[in-house]
């Protein structure tokens, strides 16, 4: 069997951390300032059509910067941090500019970069350049790191960023021995940076020197910006250690652990790091590893293992992972309360399946430190990884595949769309259309598709979006009543029948189907300027009392220009040609419903 999961095997397990939400009821998290540009609000709205325009509503829950000529201070946290994970939602006003500094020294740029084709270091999510001045005050910039993709959404929409940061390291004499590092930065679900070292502070730091800790700093002198759901995981604790590692190796096709545990081992020894490579064979062997975990403080710890074959783990006098069979790519996880001090650990594994490559890994983590690995790099080399099979869209591209809709971070799939049509464009705006119900299921910006799940090895027929994904609603959009907002209309009642699609000269498809006796043509195009989608629904033999569900979301707000902010400011919808909609609310969900005669046209911007 081909081994496809090396990269997944080398990844850290999912982190469980003591994540703390920054209070948004007052400014107590931040140092006091005489300037009044920073304030707490209940909500904010940025006018899509006005430069640097943002308004705040009285209340709590949102941190907002509204600078003017006299009040434009940066915001600095009262506490200092070293290794840290930070996540937050943020909103940019049109053409606004800000920056989030880790340790007050290393800036991640926040900017209205909506529609930028090729992002630079100065665009949203970029790591800003270093800066110095010559004797004649000439500015010199160097380094700087552009994001891998432009994942920036339109101004006035809530966006999300996750940052994992490692502080610089210093020896006892205060000499720097390791650079600061952005371990990972993602924005709107898209990877922007990974393992980027910073040789020194970026432009505009709180101080030019480097230190082991420092405060958060947010620029306040450039333009309006808002934050909510700011959460911090502080990794300031001493990490666990593993010492006194010994091993026993037994050769044979053992069916149970009792078949070898009382035997004399064929090989024994000591190790600095765990590795399965103490075995001379890649199959029909058993291994027992023993060591001492040095636990820095009493508390809850997560222990993760990765072993091929039957395996078990004992910590102290407790079996935390009973014997079970694991594939090469499987991780096993246990959460356990441990006392401070030395705690024995024992790992047993035996393997008789020749089709699996051997593998061995051990990680330990706590809320106070990131996962620490105690195995050699080569011990996780489960084979040569296959290159990803990526599909770009240098011209309008139509690609049929299965598409998993609404996949959770744990891999749970709400629905597999089996008659999905994925349409890509050189403007880097793409969408998935469900031919089983006429729904525009999802849209995304960035790169087009990862087709590895479809074409690698046996494949499962599916592909994955590669950009910043926005889920819409995979449900039949037509209903016979404005109150019929609950999505899934029975096909027997609607008499839905797909009629395929036609390709225009530019390569874009027009989808055709029949529903409620009406013949429908559905054309989705890229808007002028490549910043959104335009959708035109044309009907023949239109049924009476036919309504179209344009959008679904938790909250909807109609703006002064008649457009709508959908699903708590995730995207914009604008009805065209005088169409009038109504917002219907059922429980926590709202639906934008429009009566349809012969034609409906609307645009989506995000």
Q: Residue locations for each model-derived region?
A:
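Short, well-structured beta-strand segments within conserved domains
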Residues: 86-88, 159-165, 216, 230, ...
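Bacterial Sec-dependent N-terminal signal peptides
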Residues: 1-20
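Beta-strand-rich recognition/accessory modules
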Residues: 515, 534, 542-553, 574-606
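Short strand-turn-strand beta-turns centered on an Asx-Gly dipeptide
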Residues: 178, 186-190, 194, 306, ...
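Carbohydrate-interacting regions of secretory-pathway proteins
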Residues: 19-263, 268-273, 281-290, 294, ...
């Amino acid at each position: 069997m081909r081994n496809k999961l090396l990269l997944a095997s080398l990844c850290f397990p999912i982190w469980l951390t003591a994540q703390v939400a920054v209070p948004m009821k007052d400014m107590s998290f931040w140092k006091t300032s005489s300037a009044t540009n920073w304030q707490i609000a209940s909500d904010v709205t940025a006018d899509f059509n006005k430069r640097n325009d943002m308004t705040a509503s009285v209340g709590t829950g949102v941190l907002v910067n509204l600078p003017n000529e006299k009040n434009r201070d940066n915001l600095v946290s009262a506490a200092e941090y070293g290794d840290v994970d930070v996540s937050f939602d943020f909103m940019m006003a049109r053409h606004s500019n800000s920056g989030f500094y880790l340790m007050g020294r290393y800036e991640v740029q926040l900017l209205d970069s909506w529609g930028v084709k090729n992002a630079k270091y100065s665009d949203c999510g970029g790591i800003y350049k270093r800066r110095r001045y010559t004797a004649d005050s000439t500015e010199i910039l160097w380094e700087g790191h552009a994001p891998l993709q432009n994942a920036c959404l339109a101004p006035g929409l809530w966006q999300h960023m996750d940052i994992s940061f490692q502080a610089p390291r210093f020896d006892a004499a205060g000499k720097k021995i390791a650079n600061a590092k952005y371990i990972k930065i993602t924005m709107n679900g898209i990877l922007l940076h990974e393992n980027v070292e910073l040789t020194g502070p970026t432009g505009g730091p709180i101080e030019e020197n480097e230190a082991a800790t420092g405060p958060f700093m947010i620029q306040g002198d450039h333009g309006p910006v808002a934050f909510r759901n700011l959460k911090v995981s502080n990794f300031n604790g001493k990490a666990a250690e593993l010492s006194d590692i010994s091993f026993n190796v037994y050769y044979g096709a053992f069916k149970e652990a009792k078949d070898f545990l009382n035997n004399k081992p064929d090989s024994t020894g000591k190790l600095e790091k765990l590795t399965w490579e103490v075995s001379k064979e890649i199959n029909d062997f058993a291994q027992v590893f023993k060591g001492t975990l040095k636990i820095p403080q009493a508390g809850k710890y997560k222990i993760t293992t990765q072993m091929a074959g039957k395996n078990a783990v004992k910590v102290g006098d407790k079996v935390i992972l009973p014997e079970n069979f694991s594939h090469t790519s499987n991780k096993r996880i246990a959460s356990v309360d441990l006392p401070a001090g030395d705690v024995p650990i024992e790992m047993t594994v035996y393997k008789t399946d020749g089709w699996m490559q051997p593998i061995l890994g051990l990680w330990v983590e706590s809320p106070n430190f990131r996962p620490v690995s105690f195995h050699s790099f080569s011990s996780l080399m489960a084979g040569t990884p296959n290159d990803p099979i990526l599909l770009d869209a240098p011209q309008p591209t139509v690609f049929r595949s299965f598409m998993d809709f609404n996949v959770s971070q744990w891999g749970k799939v709400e629905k597999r769309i089996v008659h999905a049509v994925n349409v890509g464009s050189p403007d880097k705006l793409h969408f998935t259309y469900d031919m089983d119900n006429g729904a525009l299921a999802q849209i995304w910006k960035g790169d087009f598709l990862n087709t590895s799940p479809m074409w690698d090895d046996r494949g499962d027929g599916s592909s994955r979006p590669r950009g910043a994904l926005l889920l819409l609603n995979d449900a039949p959009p037509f209903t016979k009543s404005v109150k019929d907002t609950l999505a899934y209309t029975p096909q027997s009642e609607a008499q839905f029948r797909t009629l395929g699609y036609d390709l225009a000269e530019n390569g874009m498809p027009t989808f055709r189907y029949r529903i409620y006796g009406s013949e429908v043509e559905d054309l989705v195009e890229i808007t002028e300027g490549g910043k959104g989608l335009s959708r035109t629904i044309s009907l023949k033999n239109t049924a009476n009392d036919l309504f179209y569900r344009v959008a679904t979301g938790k909250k909807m707000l109609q703006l002064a220009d008649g457009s709508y902010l959908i699903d708590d400011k995730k995207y914009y919808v604008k009805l065209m040609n005088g169409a009038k909609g109504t917002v219907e609310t059922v429980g926590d969900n709202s639906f934008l419903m429009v009566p349809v005669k012969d034609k409906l046209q609307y645009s989506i911007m995000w």
